[in-house]
Amino acid sequence: MKKYLYLVLGFQACVVFGSTKALKTTAELTHWKQTGRYVEVERLCKAFTKKFPQNVDCISFGKTPEGRQMRALVVADSKKGLLSFYAKKKKRPVVFVQGGIHAGEIDGKDAGFWLIREILENEANPKTVKALKEVTLVFVPVFNVDGHERFGKHNRPNQVGPEEMGWRTTAQNYNLNRDYMKVDSPEMKAMIQLLNQWDPLIALDLHVTDGAKFQHDVSIIMEPLFYGLKETREMALEIKEMVLNGLKTEGHLPLGFYPSFLKEDEPSSGFDLGVAPPRYSQGYLGVRNRVGMLVETHSWKDYATRVKAARNVVENTLLIIAEKGKQWRKQIEILDGQVSSQVGQEMGLAFKNSEKKKEEISFLGYHYQIEDSAVSGTTKITYFSNQPEVWKVPLYTEVIPEISERIPEGYIVPKSFQSIVIPKLQAHGIQFREIEDQVGIKEVEIFRADSFKFAEKSFEGHQGLKVTGEWKKEKVTINPGDLFVSTRQPKAFLIFHLFEPKGPDSLLAWGFFNSRFEQKEYMENYVTESVAKEMLTNPEIKKVFEEKLKQSEFEESPEKRLEFFYRLHPSWDQTLGLYPVYRVQEKLK
């Protein structure tokens, strides 16, 4: 009997050990020396669901260009909590965590699996285990799946471990953390759809930073802090401070700003606070009136240290949302109503730091030396990581709008450009409608660029465009079938950023309307000479021309001189530089 009992207990121990091992990552099993391939994500996703069917759902939310499934784990305390419609109905807060948007920066994948396993096997802090009673966790281990499988030892030369890792960009060479607004990649289309489905209160994007060598192991950067509704900003700030305090208690050396020197390789130049444009994950969440958190573990820490830091950021966030998330979730719905009624309010589109306000901070760095370089022909910096130092450096804390506009009633898109605009609106889950009745001639605002400049080189598959100018009132014909996008909806801030032409992440800035800024008809020089001779008989034109000749750039350019007269001729294309979107300040019937 005793022998039989030993056999049973031994079998149970093997089952428990085997089960636990089956849920561990390659990173855990190799003591944080290696990270697994994507097949491990597939296996673990299904293994967690099999062992904890009431608590985990392994979902596929898209397919990559190379044909791989994009996986997410939904984790909650009950089967109902795994359903997005239930979470919305019960106002259950959702915490969204993604790893591997840059697949070489893969800490988030292993951190998330580690924390989920410990929670479900009751190895985590009891408060963290209980957090799932109040919160649904949606975890995407690897966003950039194809990039993850471009595995290699030399993909991250500025990073310590793991032994091999994935690549920064996708198989189509998109940097996904520049794609949130333009939604070019199949991966981003799938991700935005997932965000629309779950509507998380907060989303964490887990990265590894490059940059200088210093002692701090993790940074968190939040949005929105300097724009949007006051209550949402306060929510983001409170979460930030609570997470930082939690990390300090656990022995981490966290930062609440992005640790990039104002001048490259010059530690004494210090740091500043900033605002992430909505092309970035945290900025995108911010303009959706949600909280976005960028997590940057420090690349020069070993992999074990970095993964632990990422894990603890997620854990602290879960604890905070478990405590306050239900109240915040109810509040955010009320705030969405306020976002829908911001017509006429001024809002920043781009921001910069003022030099007026700064504070001296104690930054934990290392001794360094700057000297001339025979290689680059300039200076180089050398860090001595065995000689820790405390740097006294400035942190510039005042952030001010650089470009601002007032939120209008809405935007009208003529039929001719809807094939460009509609897919973007649908991707973001923005409401719009076709104008059915004959509106006829109506006074709207149009934007005709005073000047415009194309980017000198391609960026993320686009030739960017910068414009100057102002909206001006003009009467135009509004036709049935034209598109109306009202800002009286919860995604008003997102709409505002998409359509305001001077915004850094507007559809115009990304080059979607470049054809409207390309000259397609011309006047021969000899014809222009004849036209100019006649025009110069007009004293007013002659006076303006002679004034412009005092500008050396104009005086020395035959092209600019001839164009001056061509622009005054009736044959000049009046649609050149005309933004093909109208702005309205009154409700459309």
Locate each region found by the language model:
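Structured catalytic-domain cores with a bias toward divalent-metal coordination
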Residues: Y4-Y6, F17-K589
